[in-house]
Swiss-Prot record:
Keyword DNA damage among record annotations: no
Stored SMART domains: DEP
Organism field: Aspergillus clavatus (strain ATCC 1007 / CBS 513.65 / DSM 816 / NCTC 3887 / NRRL 1 / QM 1276 / 107)
Biased composition annotated in UniProt, kind: Basic residues: 1-12, 732-743
Protein name per Swiss-Prot or TrEMBL: Vacuolar membrane-associated protein iml1
Annotated region (Disordered), positions in chain: 1-48, 547-566, 732-822, 854-982, 1425-1483, 1825-1845
Feature: compositional bias, Low complexity: 801-822, 874-886
Protein's cellular compartments: Vacuole membrane
Record's bilayer topology term: Peripheral membrane protein
One biological process term in Gene Ontology: intracellular signal transduction
Name of the gene this protein is made from: iml1
Residues in DEP domain copies: 1344-1419
Family under the similarity heading: Belongs to the IML1 family.
Listed GO CC annotations: GATOR1 complex; vacuolar membrane
Main subcellular location: membrane
Length: 1845
């Protein structure tokens, strides 16, 4: 591993420190700091570790026993399977007993650090360093673990087996060789052992890595409970759970130090990391990407990506053997200059986006997909693609085509098109103004459908954004809110890698402006139309909408009820707010650092020495800058926008004129003078002021209005006394949570003049208070704040505002409120609780005007906690929690309360006060009545209503504490964010002062939100987070995020219900006890992204002190009565309580405003229209994407009751409860000669029969492992008679739509073979015996009413009269003979009957078999039936005896079928099939069935592992056989193992099992925005298809119309595609067709290539829509483990194939001659050896080959001519088609009749072609007895099973 820097800080989440420390300095500081400083669990574990047991000092024994020196042995598994053997008898004097924890330490020399604390401390920097080093630098594996704490080996004492003790009495202690290698032990070496306390060796965090499997978080929870909890673990330990789930312990942390072993205590936090994840790499191609490197290398910044960072990342993936799937997307935002192009911009107004720039620059976002889901191991190919796309990216996004018709300009006027050449009109924006949030949102969008098409090999999704910027981005409030909420409900990791040097402020930083509300006539462009601020004006957003108020002017002034809202909005748009998101981890790529690391690994003599500080020769290196470049602006840094001017120096800050507020120039001049005289002007500098205080003032100079000269001292004293009473009670709690730095005299914590409160950026406690409480400075003002309403709610004109009555935008402190939590008027605060999804609602709030302002009486400590005393205010402003989403107050909005006279307001000047911590408010403070009157929060752009005397009297009666709590403990737990914006943005972004942020605040664990428990130690920003980039962490199982009790009572809606186990489960796999039910309910929530809430805070809030010490890995403690457990996810909290009576009470807490506000915003901001270019797309295309941040509401009541066994109320639980769903198909392949070698007994079978035999084998497996509840199992064991296969899959050679149209009544309604036994059982008294039955009587019984079903059956184009199926006769014999107990006995008896001449095979080729074989009664035993040849039904339906499947396209396409639309949509007149079932009532039919399948037959799990298996009832062997799996709470790894075993079984019979998407290919863009089908059109339209050949009277379809897609299907057959699924329009309109998993909704028929790698749909217009099946690659990766399930020598197959030229030795899939030969892909025999890169390229090769053929006019004409001259069945699959190569016959014959030599397999690049010779005819088939062959119909039948190529 390379040297990464002085500190190894590879963690998932990262927030930067305020400045960049020197690397060595930071390393030393880390080494010298106390191990528990900043640790996340000091409160929980601190009592377990005495101060003398420092993690960095030598641990001295705390026991009274002496340390014992013993001889250690090393043994292997042949000696014992136990990892450590300990002979207690040898240590009887120590009193060691089973269960004690023993440590093993190597004996070292006296000079070693073991005996020298001083030397150990001296080597601390080296031994305790977190720097990862490579093997060349530190060859000793123990080099990182030198201290005793790190290198000791721990184990739990177990009794020594007696046989070992007897054979080796001198054995003291022995370890396995694997353990010895980890700890560096040698055999027979001396070691020290000692007894240690479990608390001293308890691990705080454990990193657990896994790969090549999909694990849900519930399985992780169960794995920890089963394999790790309360056990000793060691680094490198292999974990096997249920014999299938495999993981490895990577790192163990004790007090922030890596150790080799530790004890997994109840409070240990497991961190699971996936080494087979899906990575989405976004590369921001902003303007700086083409800038030259400022470090002097001369390369452009993109070279850092392509030559530096990405190769390093891929190499680390390869070194760690990670198997990720990589998607790379280039994205940028292009700004267009309309004036430069001299023509109207050819972009419609819907596709343009106006950013906040002064000139309304139109922009468009571009995305270029480079690779999609490509294996990370082929990184060289990835880099090649990236280089190719980089060459043309700038040209493509900058070029604007000007030939669009009726192109609207920016003002909406359409202009006639001008045929003008493409113009370079665009220019990429800077990284600062890029579309990073939209890109992240797009990448996370598909996670909303993560339960569908589940990848069974990869776990986790991580997004890496590579930007040339420095980590600062200007974003809109809506984008930040929407993206943050989308990430809040999805456990996804996001890493930001910056190519520019790290700035001197906190990063990553998002700049956003106030969500100004626009009028109804304004456009979206006007919404963000104000110019960018040239410099940073406001550094804080903790009081983000509080106007900056000068101290002098703040003392005066009055509250007025009216302000100029339009000017307010304009001024607010200039206010910048800054926030650091919790969900983003930032890294800085410095190529020099890793260049030096590589030199160290290569043992370069000039390389720097590790762990040393290299003094820099120069402190500053000047750089040469080009004047032209500087003038272009490309060299400007984002830091120029982060300057911190004092308010007096704001000459460059321009706002709207202030005349609207009645401010005269003289007033402004007096304001300046008063400001100069203000003693507080320096402490109140803008850099430390909590955000804009005077949004109502249009000029920054307005903030300098004098106000506080005459403030009475009595009022100031009262305010101080009031604050002391309000805030003091929480001082104790504050000090318990985190110590505070002493206040600096020169920088007091709070400097408030009137309405303004100043915070010290140096004070961690005060900073966090104000970050949490946006406008906590609002308290001292007794003003009533009216909720702001929507624009349309008030239409009265606004009252003019005199200069003396301008209201302040934000009061500094808020009066206490007893009835309602305060509504802080901070428009947006990315505070500790983070991001929700909503823009601010239109609410009114207090405003302050500092010009001649006078304070209102401060007698009221309440800020509108309940209903307004003035009913006019209530009537006008009352509203629900879901208010309008308008973000700007309309100018028509005016206060409902009448304007009060100056006499009604008492002047109440104030002085600066200190904010104390408020006491916790009792729950009775929250009054339900408040909710109906006051919306959830207050906005900043609002109107203040001053109090009159009545108001003051009313307020005096409410003197309880403040409405929300400001606490010092950071995080979201004790602080409420009451403005709608705060609630919308909590808990995912935190507002800070980016230029002066306390290190303690940054390293507080509350910064990391839901990811808090993923950090073993505080992260650092100066290095690349390789741990996160190499193996992303899965969302931790636990969290400490929890709201306060008041928030829980006032801001959340509670929905309680109870769940109890179903006493009558009707055979379902349901929990039998409450404890099992509770575990399943917790598991279900964990798998849906919930986290278990632990810690002190939730215990205090809930009053359940047991939660503080809750052991989440021991469910026994959770099952007792009264036990409570909380789980949280985003804004949703669930409380599960075990109550009396065996029930579980569930209470759902849902945030009041999140859903309503989110719903409002979705209507206005969810549509996103970027230009996107997918992999094969020739150009960029606009896409309209709905960025919906809110997840669909999940019905937890239904889900819990479903788990409990109450399932009658759900008609489709898989969709209603969002089951995990995957779909598979079995594709018929051509049989390899070696496959036949394993099927010696079936050599006479053709391919089709072998394929059916494979499906039959699968159905036997399914039946054998069908889930049977224990009660039914006991009943079956007593009645062990006759196992019959109930699946009854019916086979036919036509498509399901034809079957439904022709024989609906007989086959699907009247035929009992689908849902019941095919024959009626004889009474018990009439059961037969083999020994007492005669042949003639048996013949009569079989052909009787209670016998076997006899009917005319068609197979391909042959009609077999009066025959039965072997499967049905086997079942009949089993049920009607007393002495036949198994199907094998029935088959043997059937062969005896066949030998005696009772019946015979219709082709006389087979003996009697249990399967889909046709047999006829011999002529001497045949009974004539009145329906001559009609079977049981009238003659018109007599030919329909065999079912078909939904995946066939055989008879439907053939000339013999009159159904025009078989596997494609009809182009002719409407089709009206002669369906016998035609009736007034619409018939319904189910084409699939569902069964419960047990994926854990060996009972490795501690619960039932059952899935729903949906399978086809009708199947055409020429096409795919479908089955779908769905499950709710089953272990996915067991499902994967089951599917792999099925694949191995099917492979033996020439069937390829492939996972395919559930939805059709054309709908892929709905769930995966970076994918799109590739359209291919025919250059020459095909001629009209041939008239289909009709059958005689036995035909089951009437003459149909010409199939307009005849040639299209023939072309698909030529390129080796088979039908997957039919379009829903192919079925008769009068029949309701459905499947057990739902109704068919395919718009177009879908086909799949035999390799499984490509899907294609045929549109109504005759175009082809191609899509790569990326799911097949995951199955290929899984099949590498196939030898576990199939003991088959694949190497032997490869060798045999090379030397054999068997006619049937054809590789699969066969691509067409146009496609580059890709022989091995898809072949079952060589599946494990397929190169995944070739598999990734296979779809592209197939598609390009197909497109080349379709664009070649000559070949198309030749193809049409030959296909029309010799019409064949258009069923997809090489059927009776002629070939281009005459050496390849078009008809695949059985092995027994094919004798001529075929070309060598590698030369076969196409399985089937339409050119070539006429196919051969099997002579044996011609001689079939009792069969009719129709002349003129192509021969197929049993000749051609399923032409597998």
């Amino acid at each position: 591993m390379s040297l990464r820097g002085p500190m190894k800080r590879s963690h998932l989440r990262q927030v930067s420190a305020p400045s960049v420390d020197d690397l060595a300095t930071s390393s030393q500081a880390q080494a010298q700091s106390h191990p528990r400083d900043g640790g996340p669990y000091n409160d929980e574990h601190g009592q377990d570790f005495q101060s003398t047991l420092d993690a960095r000092n030598i641990r001295l024994s705390t026991t009274s026993l002496e340390r014992r020196q013993v001889s250690l042995w090393v043994h292997d598994e042949t000696f014992s399977r136990e990892e450590i053997l300990f002979n207690q008898a040898a240590f009887s004097d120590l009193g060691v007993g089973p269960g004690d924890v023993i440590e093993i330490l190597p004996v070292r020399s006296p000079g070693d650090s073991l005996h020298s604390i001083k030397s150990d401390l001296g080597l601390r920097a080296l031994r305790d360093s977190y720097v990862e080093t490579g093997p060349a630098l530190l060859p000793d594996p123990m080099s990182k673990f030198k201290t005793p704490l790190q290198s000791r080996c721990l184990f739990v004492v177990k009794p020594l087996p007696q046989e070992i003790k007897a054979r080796h009495p001198k054995l003291e202690i022995s370890v396995t060789s694997s353990v010895a290698n980890i700890f560096g032990f040698k055999n027979r070496t001396l070691v020290h052992i000692d007894v240690v306390d479990r608390a001293q060796c308890s691990a705080s965090h454990v990193d657990i890595a896994f790969r090549d499997q999909f694990l849900v978080r519930s399985d992780m929870w169960r794995l920890v409970m089963s394999e790790l909890a309360e056990k000793i673990i060691y680094k490198g330990q292999k974990i096997v759970f249920m014999g299938s789930i495999k993981a490895t312990v990577k790192n163990i942390f004790i007090r922030e130090k890596k150790v080799l072993s530790g004890y997994f205590s109840p409070h240990t936090i497991p961190v699971f990391r996936s080494e087979s994840a899906k990575y989405v790499l976004f590369i921001q191609m902003s303007r700086e990407m083409w800038d030259f490197d400022s470090e002097g290398t001369g390369d452009i910044l993109f070279s850092r990506v392509i030559n530096g960072f990405l190769p390093e990342l891929f190499k680390r993936w390869a070194n760690s053997e990670a198997k990720h799937l990589v998607t790379i997307v280039l994205f940028t935002r292009v700004e267009y200059d309309v004036s430069a192009i001299g023509a109207p911009l050819p972009l419609s107004s819907e596709t343009l986006r106006c950013i906040s720039s002064p000139n309304h620059v139109p922009t468009r976002d571009f995305y270029r997909v480079v690779v999609n889901d490509m294996a990370s191991g082929h990184w060289t190919a990835i880099l090649d693609e990236l280089k190719k796309d980089f060459r043309t990216f700038l040209r493509d996004v900058s070029t604007l085509k000007m030939d669009c018709a009726d192109t609207p300009t920016l003002d909406g006027v359409k202009v006639a098109p001008k045929n003008k050449a493409a113009t370079i009109a665009g220019r990429p924006s800077t990284a600062l103004r890029g579309n990073i949030l939209e890109a992240i949102h797009l990448a996370s969008a598909h996670l909303a459908y993560d339960h569908i098409d589940r990848d069974m090999v990869h776990t986790g999704t991580s997004i890496i954004v590579i930007t040339p910027g420095s980590g600062v981005f200007e974003v809109s409030y809506e984008s930040l809110s929407s993206t943050s909420e989308a990430l809040a409900n999805r456990g996804i990791a996001i890493d930001l890698v910056c190519l520019s040097p790290m700035p001197l402020h906190s990063v990553p930083l998002f700049k956003y402006k106030a969500p100004a509300q626009r009028s109804s006539s304004s456009s979206f462009c006007e919404f963000n139309s104000s110019g960018y601020s040239p410099e940073m004006r406001h550094s804080f957003s903790f009081a983000s909408r509080t106007p900056h108020l000068s101290p002098k002017s703040a003392a005066h002034g009055s509250f007025s009820r009216g302000t100029a809202h339009k000017e307010h909005a304009a001024s607010r748009s200039d206010e910048w707010n800054y926030g650091i998101p919790h969900w983003l981890d930032i890294s800085y790529w410095n190529p020099d650092t890793y260049r030096e690391a590589r030199r160290i690994l290569k043992k370069d003599l000039n390389a720097p020495i590790p762990f040393t500080v290299t003094k820099q020769s120069k402190t500053f290196v000047p750089r040469v800058r080009m004047y032209e470049i500087q003038m272009m602006g490309v060299m400007e840094s984002e830091q120029s926008n982060i300057s911190i001017p004092y308010l007096l120096e704001g000459e460059g800050i321009h706002r709207a004129p202030s005349l609207s507020l009645g401010l005269s120039p003289s007033a402004l001049s007096s304001t300046r003078a008063s400001y100069r005289r203000n003693p507080y002007k320096l402490p109140l500098s803008d850099s430390l002021r909590p955000e804009p205080f005077l949004q109502g003032l249009s000029n920054p100079k307005d903030v300098m209005l004098a106000r506080s000269k005459k403030a009475p001292k009595a009022v100031l004293a009262w305010m101080e006394q009031y604050d002391d009473a309000v805030f003091q009670p929480f001082a104790k709690r504050r000090h318990q949570r985190k110590p505070s730095k002493p206040k600096r005299l020169s920088e007091p914590d709070v400097q408030v003049s009137g309405a303004h409160e100043r915070l010290s950026a140096r004070s961690v406690l005060r900073l966090r208070e104000h970050e949490t409480n946006a406008n906590s400075s609002e308290r001292p003002y007794p003003t009533r704040t009216i909720p702001r309403v929507a624009e349309t709610s008030l239409s009265a004109p606004q009252t003019p505002v005199p200069s003396k009555s301008a209201s302040p935008k934000k009061p500094a402190l808020k009066p206490p409120s007893a009835g309602k939590a305060p509504r802080i008027s901070r428009t947006i605060s990315f505070a500790l609780r983070g991001l929700s999804a909503t823009p601010p609602r239109a609410l009114a709030s207090t405003e302050v005007n500092v010009e001649h302002a006078s304070a209102l009486p401060t007698s009221s400590p309440k800020l509108l906690p309940g209903p307004f005393p003035d009913t006019r205010s209530v009537d006008s402003f009352s509203g629900s929690d879901s208010a309008s989403i308008s973000t700007v107050i309309d100018t028509s909005l005016r206060p409902a309360s009448p304007h009060k006279t100056p006499q009604s307001r008492a002047i109440m000047p104030s002085r600066p006060i200190s904010i104390k911590v408020p006491p916790r408010q009792p729950s009775e403070d929250a009054e339900p009545g408040d909710r109906a009157v006051i919306p959830e929060s207050y906005s900043t752009t609002s109107t203040a209503i001053p109090f009159n005397e009545h108001h003051r009297r009313d307020s005096h009666t409410r003197t309880s504490g403040p409405r929300f709590e400001m606490t010092v403990n950071g995080g979201s737990r004790d602080s409420s964010i009451k403005s709608p914006q705060n609630k919308a943005l909590a808990p995912w972004v935190r507002s800070i002062n980016p230029c002066n942020t306390s290190r303690e605040v940054l390293r507080d664990t509350s910064w990391f939100g839901r990811w808090q428990h993923a950090y073993p130690r505080p992260p650092h920003v100066a290095v690349v987070k390789w741990k996160s980039l190499k193996s992303p962490a899965i969302l931790p199982l636990t969290t400490e995020e929890f709201p306060t009790a008041k928030e829980l009572g006032t801001d959340y809606l509670q929905t309680p219900y109870r769940v109890f186990p179903n006493d009558d489960p009707e055979g379902f796999e349901v929990p039998k006890t409450r404890g099992i039910l509770l575990r399943e309910m917790i598991s279900l929530r964990l798998s849906h992204g919930f986290q278990i809430v632990i810690g002190k805070h939730v215990a205090e809030v809930s009053g359940q002190h047991a939660l503080e010490t809750l052991n989440v890995f021991n469910t026994a403690s959770l099952e007792r009565n009264g036990a409570t457990i909380f789980l949280s996810k985003g804004n949703s909290i669930h409380r599960l309580v075990c109550v009396d009576g065996g029930e579980i009470e569930v209470t759902r807490f849902t945030h009041r405003t999140s859903s309503a506000l989110a719903a409002g915003r979705r209507d206005g901001f969810s549509l996103y229209s970027p230009a996107m270019r997918t992999i094969l797309s020739p150009e960029y295309e606009l896409k309209n994407i709905k960025l919906d941040p809110t997840a669909e509401e999940y019905n937890w009541n239904y889900a819990d009751n479903y788990v409990a066994g109450h399932r009658d109320y759900l008609f489709n639980p898989a969709q209603q409860l969002q089951f995990w769903r995957v779909r598979y198909v079995l594709i018929p392949m051509h049989l390899h000669v070696n496959t036949r070698r394993h099927l010696q007994s079936f050599n006479e079978d053709n391919e089709e029969e072998i394929h059916l035999l494979g499906i039959n084998q699968l159905t036997h497996i399914w039946q054998r492992h069908k889930y049977i509840p224990p009660e039914e199992k006991r009943f079956e064991s007593s009645n062990k008679k006759k196992e019959q296969n109930p699946l009854n899959i019916m086979y036919q050679t036509r498509n399901p739509s034809e079957v439904v149209a022709a024989e609906l009544d007989r086959i699907l309604l009247s035929d009992p073979g689908l849902d019941s036994s095919p024959a009626q059982l004889l009474p018990e008294s009439e059961l037969l015996k083999r020994s007492s039955i005669s042949l003639s009587s048996l013949a009569h019984i079989i052909q009787g009413d209670k016998g076997v079903r006899m009917m005319d059956r068609r197979w391909h184009w042959r009609l077999h009269y009066n025959c039965f199926i072997g499967f049905e006769l086997t079942t009949w014999l089993l049920q009607n003979f007393r002495d036949i107990d198994s199907r094998e006995e029935a088959v043997d008896f059937g062969n005896e009957l066949m030998k005696h001449g009772l019946f015979q095979h219709v082709e006389k080729r087979h003996n009697f078999r249990d399967g889909n074989y046709f047999y006829q009664i011999s002529s001497e035993h045949r009974i004539s039936r009145p329906e001559s040849r009609g079977g049981w039904f009238p003659q018109k339906r007599s030919d329909k005896g065999v079912p078909s499947t939904p995946a066939s396209n055989n008879a439907k396409d053939s000339p013999l079928s009159g159904h025009a639309r078989s596997d494609s949509l009809e182009d002719g007149p409407p089709h009206t099939p002669a369906t016998p079932s035609k009736s007034k009532n619409k018939a319904t039919i189910m084409l699939s069935k569902m069964m419960k399948y047990d994926v854990d037959p060996r009972k490795r799990s501690n619960r039932p592992e059952v899935i729903d298996l949906h399978y086809d009832r009708l199947h055409n062997p020429d096409n795919c056989f479908h089955f779908e799996l769905s499950w709710m709470n089953t272990t996915p790894k067991l499902i994967e193992d089951t599917v792999l075993s099925w694949a191995a079984t099917a492979e033996k019979f020439g069937l390829k099992l492939v996972q395919v998407p559930i939805a059709e290919a054309s709908a892929i863009s709905r769930t995966q925005p970076f994918r799109k089908p590739y359209r291919v059109s025919l250059k020459i339209p095909p001629p009209k298809g041939p008239v289909p050949t009709l059958f005689n009277t036995a035909s089951f379809s009437q003459p149909g119309f010409t199939d307009m897609h005849y040639y299209h299907k023939a072309m698909l057959r030529k390129f080796d595609f088979v039908l997957d699924f039919e379009a829903r329009s192919a079925f008769p309109a009068d029949v309701g067709v459905s499947y057990s998993w739902g109704t068919p909704d395919y718009q177009y028929p879908q086909y799949i290539h035999r390799s499984g790698s490509t899907l294609v749909q045929l549109t109504d217009e005759g175009d082809f829509l191609f899509l790569a099946n990326r799911l097949v690659s995951t199955r290929a990766a899984a099949s590498r483990e196939m030898p576990r399930y199939e003991r088959m020598d694949r190497a032997e197959h490869l060798r045999t194939r090379a030397a054999t030229h068997d006619p049937l030795d054809r590789l699969s899939p066969r691509l067409s001659p146009i496609v580059r030969p890709l022989h091995e892909i898809g072949s079952p025999q060589v599946q494990s050896s397929i190169d995944s890169a070739h598999l990734y390229r296979a779809p592209e090769l197939i598609i390009l080959g197909f497109a080349e053929f379709c664009n070649d006019e000559g070949r198309l004409e030749q193809f049409y001519k030959e296909s029309h001259a010799r019409p064949v069945s258009t069923k997809v699959g090489p059927a009776t088609t002629t070939l281009m190569d005459s050496s390849i016959p078009s008809l695949e014959l059985p092995a027994s009749v094919v004798s001529h030599h075929l070309s060598h397999p590698p030369a076969l690049v196409a399985r089937a072609s339409v050119d070539g010779s006429i196919s051969s005819i099997d002579v044996r088939v011609r001689a079939r007895n009792d069969s009719v062959s129709y002349k003129g119909s192509p021969r197929s039948g049993s000749l051609r099973p399923l032409n597998l190529s």
